[in-house]
UniProtKB/Swiss-Prot annotation:
Chain's role: Caps actin filaments but displays neither severing nor cross-linking nor nucleating activities. Protovillin seems to be a villin precursor with only archaic capping activity. It lacks essential changes in the sequence to allow bundling of actin filaments and consequently the appearance of microvilli.
A single cellular component GO annotation: actin cytoskeleton
CDD domains for this protein: gelsolin_S2_like (cd11289), gelsolin_S3_like (cd11292), gelsolin_S4_like (cd11293), gelsolin_S5_like (cd11288), gelsolin_S6_like (cd11291)
Organism: Dictyostelium discoideum
UniProt protein name: Protovillin
Domain spans labelled HP: 895-959
Gene that this sequence comes from: vilB
Length: 959
């Protein structure tokens, strides 16, 4: 008999919710998409692509193989290959959203290969799909900007592409090696020398050239890589920027060889005997070097030609594609002509932009790219012309610059006239527009765009600083962070970076955090980058809302300063020890110096260490002079200063244990001057800024940057400025409501100098208040007088006088003593490092005049040109700290004059004896009468700034 059938035990069936089913289905679909993408993709590890911030590069080996390039070779490009580049960055300061630029780069040997270009087009679109897929997997509901696509060709790369390789000295082009086997490749690479040519004005390009002495020219820099030795050859007319980038390249080459190669820096003026090995390896001699003209113009070599600009609207109607040419509004296009429902092609002759409206259809986007490719092949356009695709809301600065300023983001759907293409339209050539000085005086009236404002200081108006919270600070060094103790809070170093985390506790128990990553003024690029990355890591560890604020020294917002309650001091140098606590007791010997105090309330009190010199003083501020503990230190209060209480607060909070004496300006003792200035002759001069600067004047002091680097002269204001905003490539205009300064950068062009002077004149003539009698001073980069420098907090005297190439070289030479490897070798015999003739300043041969020379504008001014009678350029310059007059070789000196005359005779100015030089009447006074008249000796008078001596001579009738 069969056993009874056992029924299975019934179980409750769990029915998943509708949302659970949808979620699971979405996960299954995403997994299928990932597998399909992985199987069809030429890229490996697609889940890792774009995960980290920074640059990723792939080399295209053939039509089916793509190889990722290690970071050590990121700046090297083979001229017979093509590359794909992906740059990930944070979007608009938001650490949770990334934006991507995708480039494909074609070497010069493949420029005419249409197959390669088509393959790169496919791969760049594939990379775009991978990025979008990974973004969706991270957060499907989050808005992500569309990746921007670029085409690049060797030697014609855009500014964005070039910016990725500034730290490498620019991209390096390498010719392909003709090898027969792998072993031969290794042997040949070890023996082959390479010669690199560096050229450009702002974006230095590096190109491999023929190894021959005839490849050298006097206007550029060349680097010869011989594996065991790396030679940098500086042409006599090469720029300091080219030499600095050359040094970056040589160090990069050395690091690729594990620091085994030795670097030798040489100049064209060195003889063949100084560097025999260099000429032996290069082949030839010094006589083969070409003139600078043979290398071509730097600006022409680098600058892209921006010619006619046309805007097309793409329409796909009834399977027919139409391109409609849109007329500009006036001379330029406006974003009000862009409709979110359509796609557009912006044709700039040497650039093609494809703009995709957010509401445009997919088929319209496809035909827009296809039509851009068609335009690319018309009119014999250069093969290196890039096609850049971008979506509404993710436009880059280069694209925005093509449209009317102030209109960006004003998208409307109004109808506008569209003209079908019937022929080749010719757009009007771009012309220089007159600078609107009324917009400079009244920026709110014209609603200047963010690009023109160029404000670099972060603002957090929504942060409530009234609540107290928890403060943590880390010091950044060697890519790691080290937490510091509370006793060190508020003490910073200008060569270091810090993370400052402030947590706000609300009454309801919730909390929010603000994370500042503070960058010292002279901190290294490595520490700055590490601070940004470590800030990202700290934000992730918090697991809550966190605002990230990049904070630069001298541009700290009040909500940052308030955390330290009058205890913030910035010292010179770097923090002595990374891992252990820094005690002020242990640092007492290194604290000696002069500290400039600013701030009148706890929320803005701070102090910065400045040069210990009398010239650093300012009657409008207070200073702390710290000496040894067993001696007297001083708190010096200027006669117009409001910072007395702030200086007392910092001295008691920070410099504890020191014996301070409070001194008002005018009551200084001889001991004070001697401890401040070791040079006894300068201590007698007491040369510093003594004029009144009102609070209203401080608030209204404004700085404008004048630049012609885009081909059109532009003027824009820099808000919350500091000394670091002075760009040696441009001309700056400073208005402190009393006078106008035209600051001329060392590398500024003649056009910038001329038009900046014209702009300054128009600016003063069109001021809302009567300012026609205000003087205009023209001063040179590196020779700023006190009247100019007092407008900047903690002016660094030597900063503008430093040569970037020399300072960089000095820094590397200084690291020889502490670093494991020797970056630069200076042989003891036969090889020396000499300055080029280009770096030697030309002697001044103009007559002695005042410096700087004020300009009193006439009642009726010329608005377009500067009349010859108005001399804006000074004929002499003086150093800011230790001023000396510049004399003509024909002008008598006090030691050469033997005949003296009384003051009454010299004041007549007519019927003077024939042996008197009227340009220096004061020198013909006897020593006794000179001292009685000017209250100083002739020797001290000669060392007094020219602007002071002029006024003294005028007051006594001897000018």
């Amino acid at each position: 008999m069969e056993p009874p059938l056992e029924l299975p035990t019934q179980r409750k069936r769990v029915i998943p919710s509708k949302f659970g089913i949808l979620k699971r289905n979405a996960e299954i679909e995403a997994e299928k998409n990932r597998e399909n993408l992985q199987q069809s993709s030429c890229f490996s590890h697609i889940n890792e692509i774009g995960k980290e911030i920074g640059l990723e590069i792939w080399k295209i080996i053939d039509d089916s193989t793509i190889q990722k390039v290690p970071k050590v070779n990121h700046s090297t490009f083979e001229t017979n290959k093509s590359y794909l580049l992906l740059m990930g960055q944070f979007y608009d300061g938001n650490m949770n959203i990334k934006t991507y630029n995708i480039h494909f780069w074609i070497g010069e040997l493949l420029i005419n290969s249409q197959e390669t270009i088509n393959f790169c087009n496919d791969r760049i679109e594939e990379l775009e799909r991978i990025i979008k897929y990974n973004q969706k997997q991270f957060d499907s509901e989050q808005f992500y900007p569309e990746p921007i696509l670029y085409r690049e060709f060797q030697g014609k790369e855009g500014d964005i592409f070039m910016s990725y390789f500034k730290s490498y000295g620019g991209p390096r082009y390498v010719a392909p090696l003709k090898l027969t086997s792998a072993s031969a490749a290794i042997a040949t690479a070890a023996k082959q020398y390479k010669l690199f040519h560096l050229k450009g004005r702002r974006n230095i390009r590096v190109k491999q050239v023929d190894i021959s002495s005839k490849s050298l020219n006097s206007g550029d820099v060349f680097v010869l890589d011989c594996e065991d030795f790396i030679y940098q050859w500086n042409g006599s007319e090469s720029s300091r920027l080219e030499k600095g980038k050359g040094l970056d390249l040589t160090i990069r080459l050395r690091d690729e060889k594990s620091a085994k190669a030795k670097i030798i820096v040489m100049d064209e003026n060195d003889t063949d005997k100084d560097h025999p090995e260099f000429w032996k390896r290069l082949g030839g001699c010094k006589d083969d070097v070409q003139k600078a003209e043979q290398g071509g113009d730097d600006f022409a070599y680098e600058k892209k030609s921006v010619e006619q600009i046309k805007l097309y609207q793409v329409e796909n109607l009834n399977y027919e594609v139409h391109l409609h040419l849109i007329d500009p509004i006036g001379d330029v296009y406006s974003t009000t002509q862009l409709n979110a429902e359509f796609c557009y092609i912006l044709d700039c002759e040497t650039e093609l932009y494809v703009w995709l409206g957010k509401a445009s259809a997919n088929d319209q986007r496809t035909v827009a790219m296809a039509n851009a490719m068609d335009l690319l092949h018309e009119d014999n356009r250069p093969s290196w012309t890039p096609i850049i695709k971008m979506t509404q809301g993710s436009e880059n600065t280069l694209f925005k610059d093509k449209f009317k300023k102030g209109s960006w983001g004003e998208y409307v759907n109004d109808n506008f006239e569209k003209k079908p293409i019937t022929g080749k339209g010719v757009a009007a050539k771009a012309v220089q527009e007159k600078i609107n000085v009324d917009a400079l005086h009244n920026p709110e009236k014209y609603q200047l765009s963010k690009e023109e404002r160029k404000s670099t200081i972060p603002t957090l108006h929504h942060v409530d600083d009234k609540h107290r919270g928890e403060l943590k600070i880390w010091h950044v060094r060697n890519r790691n962070k080290f937490e510091i103790s509370q006793s060190e809070f508020g003490l910073f170093y200008n060569q270091s970076c810090y993370l400052v985390l402030f947590t706000l506790f609300a009454a309801d128990g919730s909390n929010n955090s603000i994370l500042y990553y503070w960058q010292g003024r002279f901190s290294s690029s490595e520490d700055k980058g590490a601070a940004a990355l470590l800030a990202k890591d700290v934000g992730k560890e918090l697991h809550r809302s966190c605002i990230h604020v990049r904070t630069v020294q001298n541009k700290e917002p009040n909500h940052f300063l308030e955390h330290f309650q009058g205890r913030m001091v910035v010292f010179k140098g770097s923090r002595p020890n990374a891992t252990t606590e820094v005690s002020l007791e242990n640092l007492s010997s290194s604290l000696q110096g002069l500290y400039h105090v600013r701030g009148t309330e706890p929320i803005n009190i701070h102090s910065i260490q400045v040069e210990k010199a009398i010239s650093s003083l300012d009657s409008n501020d207070s200073f702390i002079l710290v000496n040894f503990k067993n001696t007297i230190s001083y708190i010096w209060v200027g006669k117009y200063s409001d910072e007395k209480e702030a200086a007392l607060q910092i001295s008691s909070n920070v410099f504890t244990g020191y014996n301070f004496q409070l001194i008002d300006e005018g009551d200084e003792t001889s001991e004070f001057w001697e401890s401040l200035e070791t040079n006894s002759s300068l201590s007698l001069l007491k040369d510093y800024y003594t004029q009144l600067r009102t609070v209203e004047q401080e608030k209204k002091t404004r700085l404008f940057q004048c630049s012609n680097n885009s081909g059109v002269f532009k003027v824009f204001e820099i808000h919350d400025f500091s000394q670091d905003d002075l760009d040696s490539d441009d001309v700056m205009i400073l208005d402190n409501q009393k006078q106008i300064f035209v600051w001329v950068g060392k590398e500024s062009s003649d056009t910038e100098k001329l038009m900046a002077n014209e702009t300054a004149l128009e600016y003063i003539m069109n001021a809302p208040t009567h300012r026609r009698d205000d003087p205009i001073f023209t001063i040179q980069d590196g020779f700023e007088p006190h009247e100019f420098t007092f407008n900047f907090h903690a002016w660094q005297v030597n900063k503008t006088q430093q040569d970037s190439y020399k300072s960089k070289l000095s820094a590397i030479l200084g690291s020889n003593n502490s670093g494991p490897a020797s970056p630069i070798m200076l042989p003891t015999s036969g090889v020396t490092l000499k300055p080029t003739t280009a770096a030697t300043p030309k002697p001044i041969t103009t007559p002695t005049v005042t410096t700087p020379k004020p300009i009193t504008t006439p009642t009726v001014a010329t608005l377009k040109t500067v009349t010859p009678a108005v001399t804006l350029k000074p004929t002499t310059v003086t150093t800011p700290s230790k001023v000396a007059t510049t004399t003509n070789t024909s002008t008598p000196s006090p030691t050469t004059i033997t005949t003296f005359y009384p003051l009454s005779v010299l004041k007549q100015k007519t019927n003077l004896p024939n042996d008197i030089d009227k340009s220096c009447l004061h020198l013909y006074l006897s020593d006794e009468e000179f001292l009685s008249t000017f209250k100083m000796t002739k020797e001290i008078f000669q060392k007094t700034p020219a602007w002071k001596t002029k006024q003294l001579r005028v007051d006594n009738g001897l000018f």
